[in-house]
Amino acid sequence: MKGRGLKRRVLLQGGSIALMLGVHQIARGATILAVRVWPAADYTRVTIESDARLSSQQLVVGSPPRLAVDIEGIELSPELRELVGKIKPGDPYINGLRVGQNAPKVVRIVFDLKQAVVPQVFSLAPVAAYKHRLVLDLYPEQAIDPMEALIAERLRDAPRGGNSNNSSAAVAGAPPAPARPAPPAVDPLGDLMAQQAVRPGPPAPPPPVVTGSERPTGLPVPLTPPPPAVAAAPARPVAPPVAAGRGDATASRTDRIIIVALDPGHGGEDPGAIGPNGTREKDIVLQVAHRLRERINASSVNGSPMRAFLTRDADFFVPLGVRVQKARRVQADLFVSIHADAFTTPAARGASVFALSQSGASSSAARWLANKENDADKVGGVNVGNHEAQVQRALLDMSTTAQINDSLKLGGAMLGEIKGIGARLHKGQVEQAGFAVLKAPDIPSVLVETAFISNPEEEANLRRVDYQENLADALMRGIQR
């Protein structure tokens, strides 16, 4: 009996110690592991990564515009203080921020804003290399219109791009344009200016702004999601009537613009594949996309000027559905998604081109790769509670047989040109799988895996400027065929 009582006391003491440790763990709260800021014209994202889920409340304040975020259950840490230095002068939305211990176990971050924003605040569960993430996305009250962005870019380039219609020869390997009478001095994108000036229907009212006197500072404010980024597409631009005396042949060469949507994969929180020497896919494909954009903007097809539109032009994350929406908004004629993926073994090598499949993947490797790419939203971070995210997913279910057939032709032309620069091909024909980013119903769409970044030799090639230039040349010729 005495031994049994001693054993019971030992167990009780052990339980008390375990309980005390549990209380200590709860009192300690979450540990902040890292903070990141991703500024972009579309929106600015602030990510706070921790070893446990964070609870937060937020308050929007006007005059001047500010956003206060209270993070509960933590103490101010050096990692959180790093946020102050991560705000860049060129951030479109954040002018600066302050961070401090607002109350015991409550850290407050106050964002001083350059303009009124519509914030989305949500949590992401651990995935890939990330632990728990608290995400703050700051959107403008009026969503960025991709068509207006394309117009603005065209206007910026106008002083140095006046002779783009005759510059096909600027692309390596492309034949010089034949001599022809000068076309009318018009910019096909210019006609869109008037169309964009008058939008159908009244603009959506901005979300309510709560001042400090209207609501206690410790209470959360219901946040209205930003308006959808895609509005009703305007009619395809056409040139004004040709002056008397000009031939019909000349007029027909300037009656429209050919828009190519370039989609550099991944970005922001999502680095994509990482090579053995640390090369990040998101960086390489953005560089290739910029080089290809230069070639497209300097080219024409049968006299019709070409224009490239990038779904992202900097290091920020764009959800898969939004990439498709952007391409449709600018009425793209082609969609080219650029990647440089990895495989489970470094022996995998060679470039590949993929089109959409409605009836299963053409190979097990294609299926594996499609599943991997379709998980990009999980790593990049999508607010699944946002209604617009559901709308975007619905958009991706309307692919057509005609679109797929045209995509296969485009992909075949690109494969031939990539082989022509001496690059190794992983497969000699266009493969097919259910890539979500290729599901625009009305745009021929391909996904180009430029190489396997997991292969040391191909990783080194992808880092070389001359290789990127040759690759951009090959893709350009494939587009023009």
Segment roles from a protein language model:
Residues E75, V117, Q142, I296, ...:
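Conserved NTP-handling cores and scaffolds of large molecular machines
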Residues G190-P200, V210-A389, T400-L410, D473:
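Catalytic-core regions of hydrolytic enzymes
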Residues I74-L76, G265-E269, F343, A451-N455:
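Short connector loops/turns at beta-strand edges and beta->alpha or beta->beta junctions
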Residues R81, P271-G278, P456-L462:
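Short acidic, glycine/proline-rich loop/turn micro-motifs
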Residues R45-E49, R66-E72, G96-G100, R108-D112, ...:
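Soluble periplasmic/extracytoplasmic beta-strand elements of cell-envelope proteins
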Residues K2-R253, I258:
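Signal-peptide-cleaved, periplasmic/extracellular N-terminal interaction regions immediately downstream
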